[in-house]
A protein has these predicted regions:
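Walker A/P-loop
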Residues: 14
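Hydrophobic anchor at the beta1->P-loop junction of P-loop NTPases
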Residues: 3-5
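P-loop (Walker A) phosphate-binding loop of NTP-binding proteins
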Residues: 8, 20
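NTP-dependent small-molecule kinase module
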Residues: 94, 112-121, 125-138, 152-211
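ATP-dependent small-molecule kinase phosphotransfer cores
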Residues: 32-98
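Residue-level signal for inorganic ion chemistry
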Residues: 31, 81, 100, 143, ...
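ATP-binding Walker
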Residues: 11
Length: 211
């Protein structure tokens, strides 16, 4: 059984993933993996350089200015980069042997096809906006621009199997404990836990209708 965790920007999905560590659950971070692969994969480096230009990497480091300029030239350019990076992340996750993964673009990227169940972390719009403004020190308008690049929260809620509400008031741990795919790990032995992608350490969940 493989589980995906998603949520729009500012929803607090990474916070929920950190709470899962209390159950000994290790979560594969798709965003971190993408950054690592862009930096280390010879295949990705070659394909991005062919796509963007010879100044894509400077002294082995991704030239973010060149990438940003490339993205501004056409809406299709982001899709072209994704077509290079996403398959590599999919393969890396499959080869990792891990059974839990976190992705902000679970459905947009198609990586949801690699998991059996999806948990969505949600929060009210204004809460999300405020979190991102404080975290990244950016304007409200910039946050809204980023949000527009992701599926609407309500659409993701409809597709996900479970929902964890992270509005700053709801008990996160109580909601996590209610998810069957988490509670079943409580009595696993150490060796079995490791084989399931978790370490030796090991109520108000909303179940969503699958679409």
């Amino acid at each position: 059984m493989k589980i995906g965790i998603t949520g729009g920007i500012g929803s607090g999905k990474s916070f929920v993933c950190r709470r899962l560590a209390r159950y000994g659950i290790e979560v594969y971070d798709c965003d971190a993996a993408a950054k690592r692969l862009i930096r280390t994969s010879p295949k990705i480096r070659q394909e991005l350089t062919t796509l963007i230009g010879c100044d894509t990497y400077i002294d082995g480091t991704l030239n973010k200015a060149a990438v940003a300029q490339f993205l501004l030239q056409s809406d299709d350019h982001a899709k072209a980069i994704d077509a290079i990076v996403h398959p590599a992340v999919f393969q890396d996750f499959e080869e990792s042997g891990m059974t839990w993964m976190e992705s902000a673009i679970m459905y947009e990227s198609g990586i949801y096809r690699l998991v059996d169940k999806v948990i969505v972390v949600t929060a009210p719009l204004e809460v999300r906006i405020d979190r991102v403004m404080q975290r990244d020190h950016i304007t409200r308008e910039k946050v809204l621009q980023w949000m527009q690049r992701q599926l609407p929260q309500e659409e993701v809620r409809k597709r996900a199997h479970y929902e964890i509400i992270n509005d700053g008031k709801a008990d996160i741990d109580a909601q996590i404990a209610q998810i069957p795919e988490i509670s079943k790990y409580r009595n696993l032995g150490i060796s079995e836990c490791r084989n399931n992608g978790i370490s030796k350490h090991r109520n108000n969940i909303t179940k969503r209708k699958t679409i």
